[in-house]
Amino acid sequence: MLATLWLVGLSLPMLWAQRLISCPYKNVCQYALLSGSDVILQCNYPKALWYFSSSLEDKLSLVNSKPDGRVLPGSDLQLSDPKPSQTGLYRCLDNHKARLVEYEIDFQNIALLHITHKDLGQEPMGNESMNLGGKVLVFTRWDPWQDCNRCQKPGERKRLGYCYVEEPQEKPMPCWLYLREEKVTNSRLRPELQLQACQVPCDTATETNQPYFVFDTYLLDKPNSNARLKCPLASIYRPVHWEADNSPLTWQDQLSGQTVSTIMDLHSGGQHLKVFQPATYRCFVEQELIAQFNPTERQSKAQNPWQPRIQPDKADSVLRRLKLMVLSISVLAVGGLLCKVVFRPVCGKKRSQVLLVK
C-alpha cells in the first residue's frame, strides 16, 4: 500500500524541493536569488494572473503562457531553472487587474559564484567602492548559515551571499536590479558561497522509519567511465551531504584537491555528484538519508542505467513531508478507509521502507 502511494506521489512535481518565496498581501518585496535553482513565488489567490517585466523593458507580459513559468493550483508561480535574464518584476493580479502581491527578483548568475572555505584560509570578497553613474558601495549581503550537513560527526555548513549596491543615503538594492539595462563588467559584481566545518549533536526526535530512494547503477563498468548522480530533494538552499562506502565526501577535501574519485557540483550546492569508480553512494538532505546508489555489474546492453527494486531499511522524515504534500485529498481518504476497514490489524505500526525508482 505504501509503495503504491509513493509511486503515485512520484508522478507529481517535487514542490517541497523548491524554495518558497513569500510577500505580504498588497506589498512589493525585493529578493536576490541564484539562477539555476527552482523557486516558487507565492500569491495564494484563486485564478490569479501573473505578469512579468524584465529589467530591460517596461512592458508587462503574461507569465502564464511562458514555458519557464508555470502557475500552480492556488496561483503560486513556479520558475524552473531561472536564468539571469529573468531578473525583473513579477506581479500577481486578481481578475480585476488589482495587485495582490509583487516581487522584484534578481536572479544572480550562478556561473559567477565566488566560492571560499573558511578552514582553508580563504576569505570572501570585501566591500568595494565603484563608480556606476555615481559613487556607490558594492557589498555582499549574506543569508544565515545553513544547518550543519551532519550531526554527531564532523560536517560542513554553507551560507549564500548576494551582490548588493548601496548609494549614499539610499536603501541597498540587488546589483542587477540596480544596474538594469547598464552593461557593467566587474569581478566584484557576483554572488558568493562560503563553507566551513561544523559539528552538532543529533536531534533525538528525528524519525527513522520513513522511505528513501535506492538506485542500482550500471554506468561504471567500463574504463574511464563516470556517472552523474542526483540527490532527490537537494538544492543549493539546503544542507546536503554525500558518503562513498560510508566515508564522508567533504567540500574541504575537494577544494584542496584531495578528492580525485568524486566531484560534488558546486553550482547546485552538492545536489549532483560526479563519480568515477564503483561504490555505494548515499546522500543526505538536512541530515536525513534521502537516496542510496548501489554499484551493479551490467547484465545486458538493453538494461536501463537505473534499475528499481524494493527492500526494507531505515530512512528519515524529509520524504514523509514530501509524501504529505504530493498525495491528493482523495488518495488520503481512500488510504484511510482501506487502513480502517481492510488493514486494521496492522494500522498504527511503523514500518520502514526503501523505495527504488528509475
Curated annotation (Swiss-Prot):
Membrane-topology annotation of the record: Single-pass type I membrane protein
Keyword Membrane listed: yes
Broad class of the protein's primary localization: membrane
Keywords associated with the record: Glycoprotein, Membrane, Signal, Transmembrane, Transmembrane helix
Topological domain spans for side Cytoplasmic: 344-358
Leader sequence residues: 1-17
Subcellular location: Membrane
Sequence intervals crossing the membrane: 323-343
SUPFAM superfamilies attached to this UniProt entry: Immunoglobulin
Positions in the Extracellular compartment: 18-322
A GO CC annotation given for this chain: membrane
The family this protein is said to belong to: Belongs to the FAM187 family.
Protein name in UniProt: Protein FAM187B
Organism lineage string: Eukaryota, Metazoa, Chordata, Craniata, Vertebrata
Gene that produces this protein: Fam187b
